[in-house]
Amino acid sequence: MDCKILVLGAGGLGCEILKNLTMLSFVKQVHIVDIDTIELTNLNRQFLFCDKDIGKPKAQVAAQYVNTRFPQLEVVAHVQDLTTLPPSFYKDFQFIISGLDAIEPRRFINETLVKLTLESNYEICIPFIDGGTEGLKGHVKTIIPGITACWECSIDTLPSQQDTVPMCTIANNPRCIEHVVEYVSTIQYPDLNIESTADMEFLLEKCCERAAQFSISTEKLSTSFILGIIKSIIPSVSTTNAMVAATCCTQMVKIYNDLIDLENGNNFTLINCSEGCFMYSFKFERLPDCTVCSNSNSN
């Protein structure tokens, strides 16, 4: 059976996932969704893009790159917010693989897929494979809606500060004041000294200006707030992206070839490359009181 795959995100992880899919003969069509555009700072790890692509939509450029070089695979780009797409869009795919860098879109797609499964009485059950990276660490969650733990079941495994901003494309679509601070401090003025009072006051001024451009509240903005954000910024590492993307695609291949026990097999993989290379897989159990997938909420 030929497969139609949906990839969420065309950043560092999404590019790696898309590259891997070009090498799978059973994958005939891939749709990729991303609202962001390409920035100079992306080019060190998002290798489907180059200098001439700066300012262009990521999904569009990634699709064009693959379609030109791999004619056996059709890639369709969607330059939009995935939360604006209707449920009918998602039900056409055999697998959905996420390379997203934000929490809320993951929660949205998880809830959408669980709802599709339950409302169809399991006639529609689309595996959702979620990859995530944070510096030299990463994870892969394999979710079979209505059968295994859903994404919401494991939300308590996230760091307590969920709004820690990864080093990704925030230039054209800042959603909060944290995104503003990251852009100003790491892209516009990366050489300022955070120990200098004058430099921190300058950053505060520039953050206020950028926030005003995007109608973002500056209520909690201060030099101490900016310092806290700068210290929490996590870089994106290409090798971690490659390992997580490979694990995502391996899980998909296992499911496609019926090589995994969907109900009782391991569905959560942790990757830690901060001291050597460590990978650990285990079964994450469903929460009986999960607000998305528990029996009490699905009736």
UniProtKB/Swiss-Prot annotation:
GO molecular function: ATP binding; NEDD8 activating enzyme activity
Miscellaneous comment in the UniProt entry for this protein: Present with 752 molecules/cell in log phase SD medium.
Protein name per its UniProtKB record: NEDD8-activating enzyme E1 catalytic subunit
Family, similarity comment: Belongs to the ubiquitin-activating E1 family. UBA3 subfamily.
Gene that produces this protein: UBA3
Active site, per annotation: 168 (glycyl thioester intermediate)
Description of how the protein assembles with itself and partners: Heterodimer of UBA3 and ULA1. Interacts with NEDD8 and UBC12.
Keywords in alphabetical order: ATP-binding, Ligase, Nucleotide-binding, Ubl conjugation pathway
Enzyme Commission numbers on file: 6.2.1.64
EC top class named in words: ligase
Biological-process GO terms, alphabetical: protein neddylation
Organism from which the protein derives: Saccharomyces cerevisiae (strain ATCC 204508 / S288c)
Biological or metabolic pathway of the protein: Protein modification; protein neddylation
Matches recorded under PROSITE patterns: UBIQUITIN_ACTIVAT_2
A GO CC term attached to the entry: nucleus
Function: Catalytic subunit of the dimeric UBA3-ULA1 E1 enzyme. E1 activates NEDD8/RUB1 by first adenylating its C-terminal glycine residue with ATP, thereafter linking this residue to the side chain of the catalytic cysteine, yielding a NEDD8-UBA3 thioester and free AMP. E1 finally transfers NEDD8 to the catalytic cysteine of UBC12.
Binding site for ATP: 12-37
Catalysis: reaction(s): ATP + [NEDD8 protein] + [E1 NEDD8-activating enzyme]-L-cysteine = AMP + diphosphate + [E1 NEDD8-activating enzyme]-S-[NEDD8 protein]-yl-L-cysteine
